[in-house]
C-alpha cells in the first residue's frame, strides 16, 4: 500500500497513537519495518480451545466415526484440569499466531475464561 513511502507508527505503551509520514516523537526503540506488514490482530470466531489436546487423534478418520469412537468417549473422561490445560495451550498458540480475540464453543466455558 505504501511501497514508495516511509510510514511511521508511534506506539506509546501498548497503544498505537499515530500513523503517518514523518512523525517526530521521542523513541526508546526504533524498528525497521521494511518489507513487513502491520495488520490488526486476528479474531477466531469459532473454536473448541481445549480440543487442542486431541490434535492428531484419529485425524485420518471420517467425521462421525472420529466423533463417536475417539472424541466423545474421551471428552466424557475430561476433568476440569484437562479443559484448563487444553485451553491454556490453545491460548498460547493463538497468541503466537496473532489471534487477539476468540469465541470458545466448548464444555466448561468458565474454566476456559479462567485461562484468559
What are these model-predicted stretches?
Residues 1-26, 36:
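N-terminal metal-binding scaffold of metallo-dependent hydrolase/deaminase domains
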Residues 53-85:
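Active-site gating loops and adjacent loop-to-helix segments of metal-dependent hydrolytic enzymes
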Residues 28-32:
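Conserved beta-strand scaffold positions in the cores of enzyme catalytic domains, especially
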Residues 21-24, 43, 55:
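Residue-level structural signal for beta-strand termini and adjacent loop
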Residues 34-41, 91:
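A generic hydrophobic-helix recognition signal that picks specific residues
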Residues 76-116:
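Active-site loop-helix segments enriched in His/Asp/Glu that coordinate
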Residues 14, 35, 46, 98, ...:
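Divalent metal-coordination and catalytic microenvironments
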Residues 41-52:
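Histidine-centered catalytic micro-motifs
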Amino acid at each position: 500500500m505504501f511501497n514508495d513511502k516511509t510510514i511511521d507508527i508511534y506506539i506509546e505503551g501498548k497503544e498505537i497513537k499515530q500513523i503517518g509520514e514523518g512523525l517526530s516523537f521521542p523513541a526508546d526503540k526504533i524498528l525497521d519495518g521494511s518489507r513487513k506488514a502491520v495488520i490488526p490482530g486476528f479474531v477466531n470466531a469459532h473454536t473448541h480451545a481445549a480440543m487442542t489436546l486431541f490434535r492428531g487423534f484419529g485425524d485420518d478418520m471420517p467425521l462421525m466415526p472420529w466423533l463417536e469412537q475417539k472424541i466423545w468417549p474421551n471428552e466424557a473422561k475430561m476433568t476440569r484440569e484437562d479443559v484448563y490445560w487444553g485451553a491454556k495451550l490453545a491460548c498460547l498458540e493463538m497468541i503466537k499466531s496473532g489471534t487477539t480475540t476468540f469465541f470458545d464453543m466448548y464444555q466448561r466455558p468458565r474454566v476456559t475464561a479462567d485461562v484468559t
